[in-house]
């Protein structure tokens, strides 16, 4: 049974501006160690921004699906987006969430999008 859905769209250009302006202060607040480590595989700033934009969109889509916001029991670093062994995007959440999470990520040009479905 579906218990929540969420979608979010993030500007890759805006993410790149945030990364240029705030650097490690921003990534340390918003992203998990796994997400930061995974970004190191990219060689240029635009690819890094695309990586973080998709993960940021996934976090926002997740909290929308749950029906809460960040700071209301969910912290940004407590939601970690990674790819499994087959390359499928996954979300790991700190604590027992009591539901299954399906995640789809995409990017095209200057935008990244995430769609989350929660089900039991």
Curated annotation (Swiss-Prot):
Location(s), subcellular: Cytoplasm
Gene3D superfamilies: 4'-phosphopantetheinyl transferase domain
Domain of life: Bacteria
Cofactor section: Mg(2+)
Major location category of this protein: cytoplasm
Sequence intervals crossing the membrane: none
GO molecular function list: holo-[acyl-carrier-protein] synthase activity; magnesium ion binding
Binding site for Mg(2+): 8, 60
EC assignment: 2.7.8.7
Annotated catalysed reactions: apo-[ACP] + CoA = holo-[ACP] + adenosine 3',5'-bisphosphate + H(+)
GO cellular component: cytoplasm
GO BP term, example: fatty acid biosynthetic process
The entry's keywords: Cytoplasm, Fatty acid biosynthesis, Fatty acid metabolism, Lipid biosynthesis, Lipid metabolism, Magnesium, Metal-binding, Transferase
InterPro entries per UniProt: 4-PPantetheinyl_Trfase_dom, 4-PPantetheinyl_Trfase_dom_sf, ACPS, Ppantetheine-prot_Trfase_dom
Pfam family, one: ACPS
Function, in words: Transfers the 4'-phosphopantetheine moiety from coenzyme A to a Ser of acyl-carrier-protein.
Membership in a protein family: Belongs to the P-Pant transferase superfamily. AcpS family.
Protein name (Swiss-Prot/TrEMBL): Holo-[acyl-carrier-protein] synthase
Species of the source: Anaplasma marginale (strain St. Maries)
Lineage: Bacteria, Pseudomonadati, Pseudomonadota, Alphaproteobacteria, Rickettsiales
Gene from which this protein is expressed: acpS
């Amino acid at each position: 049974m579906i218990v929540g859905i969420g979608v979010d769209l993030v500007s890759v250009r805006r993410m790149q501006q945030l990364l240029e302006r705030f650097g490690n202060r921003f990534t340390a607040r918003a992203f998990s160690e796994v997400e930061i480590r995974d970004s190191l595989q990219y060689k240029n700033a635009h690819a890094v921004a695309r990586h973080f934009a998709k993960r940021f969109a996934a976090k926002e889509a997740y909290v929308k699906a749950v029906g809460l916001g960040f700071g209301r029991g969910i912290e940004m670093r407590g939601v970690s987006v990674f790819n499994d062994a087959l390359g499928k995007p996954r979300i790991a959440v700190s604590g027992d969430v009591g539901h299954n999470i399906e995640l789809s990520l995409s990017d095209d040009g200057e935008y990244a999008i995430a769609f989350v479905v929660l089900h039991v």
